[in-house]
Design a protein with these regions (language model features):
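Flavin (primarily FAD) binding-site architecture
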Residues: 207-221
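N-terminal Rossmann-like FAD-binding beta1-loop-alpha1 element of flavoenzymes
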Residues: 11-35
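C-terminal catalytic lobe of FAD-dependent flavoproteins
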Residues: 160, 225-232, 238-240, 248-265, ...
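Glycine-rich FAD pyrophosphate-binding loop
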Residues: 28-48
Length: 381
């Protein structure tokens, strides 16, 4: 810590999830002097509490085409640069008897418009390539979904950021922003083991703290209208499916089953929660029951598969309407230049998006930081 206190950084990044880690890597690869701070350990927030799905973007093709297009582009990039974190499972979007088979046509057309490979296959072929799938399905579409380990992905970004010169601190919580004449010039950190507090200075702060980013900007009397959407998931005791299985319908609860190493994960729910609960999420029996009931419709053998555990995360969505679930809010990237937006120089917030688009989020945030620092350096990630 003493070596950090004696440095002046170009950029301090708040948040040790995959977005913060990716931003640290991008900044460091462009030659910036970088410090990343995380209040607990890496992947403690939304990064470590999701499906582990490498989206093809197909899920959003009908309802959020911009996000779908971002997903498939990043899907292809991550398969190349982070193949050691990915299992190329492919995915099925299945239509069940209670679903509208006409939606399949809209779905495939929307995928094609977004640049996503989506091939209709027969129910017989779907059962052949994925024996666990509901045998009553009446339609299926094959897409390039995959499984990704978010913990390995985050750690890989952290290690490469460090290799390029970034400093990394965990268990250092930002408890204040250093403000001077309408400008952010650093952060005040508290060691969550010892309670010791110190100031570290920089030219730009990048707020990549996910849903907790709301608390960061409040330290400068700035507001982001974020929508904390809780998502609950279940891990089952063994791997039921070898391909990702989705329902071919608009996004809803418990409509994705993801194979993950020796287990599988079903999810997710989506419910708005209050900010005072995001650090102490409670999983309800009703949520578990919904996940089991709907999950069995994807793969009936889940009915007799042991549940290992339930967990929940909070999506860092930016509120755009009165949707109580957050399903209709775009999963697109939000990059806020607080100098333009709020008259507060030296602060950038990168939020929204998904784990899937972390690399692009990092690129967008780093591009803006470099512009403000008058540094000409192109993205190398």
């Amino acid at each position: 810590m003493s070596s950090v206190l004696n440095k002046d950084y170009d950029v301090i990044i708040i948040g040790g999830g995959v977005t913060g880690a990716g931003t640290a890597r991008d900044c460091a690869m462009r030659g910036l002097r970088v410090l990343l701070v995380e209040k607990y350990d890496f992947s403690n927030g939304a990064t470590g509490r999701n499906h582990g799905l490498l989206h093809s973007g197909a899920r959003y093709a009908v309802t959020d085409p911009e996000s779908a297009s971002e997903c498939i582009k990043e899907n292809m990039i991550l398969r190349r640069i982070a193949h050691h974190c990915i299992e190329a499972t492919d995915g099925l979007f299945i239509t069940l008897p209670e679903d509208d088979i006409q939606y399949q046509k809209t779905f495939v057309e929307s995928c094609q418009e977004a640049g996503i490979s989506a091939n209709i296959i027969s129910p017989e072929e779907a059962r052949r390539i994925e024996p666990s799938v509901n045998p009553d399905l009446i339609g299926a579409v094959r897409v390039p979904d995959a499984s990704v380990d978010p913990f390995h992905l985050t750690t890989a970004n952290i290690l490469d950021a460090r290799r390029h010169g970034a400093d990394i601190l965990t268990y250092q919580q930002v408890v204040g922003l250093v403000l001077n004449n309408g400008r952010v010039e650093g952060v005040r950190l508290r060691n969550n083991h010892t309670g010791e507090e110190n100031e570290v200075h920089c030219r730009i702060v990048i707020n990549a703290a996910g849903i907790w980013g709301h608390d960061i900007v409040k330290m400068a009397d700035v507001k982001i209208n974020m929508f904390p959407a809780k998502g609950t998931l279940l891990i089952f005791g063994h791997r039921v499916n070898n391909m990702v299985i989705n329902r071919c319908r608009k996004p809803a609860n418990a409509d994705i089953l993801v194979p993950d190493d020796a287990v599988c994960v079903i999810g997710t729910t989506s419910d708005r929660v209050s900010y005072d609960t995001i650090d102490n999420l409670k999983i309800t029996q009703e949520e578990v029951d919904v996940l089991i009931k709907e999950g069995e419709k994807l793969a009936p053998s889940l009915a007799t598969t042991r549940i290992l555990r339930a967990y929940a995360g909070v999506r860092p969505l930016v509120a755009a309407d009165n949707d109580p679930s957050g399903r209709s809010i775009s999963r697109g990237i939000i990059c806020l230049d607080h100098e333009k937006r709020d008259g507060l120089a030296g602060l950038i917030t990168i939020t929204g998006g998904k784990m899937m688009t972390y690399r692009l989020m990092a690129e967008v945030a780093t591009d803006l930081a470099c512009k403000k620092l008058d540094i000409e350096a192109v993205c190398q990630t």
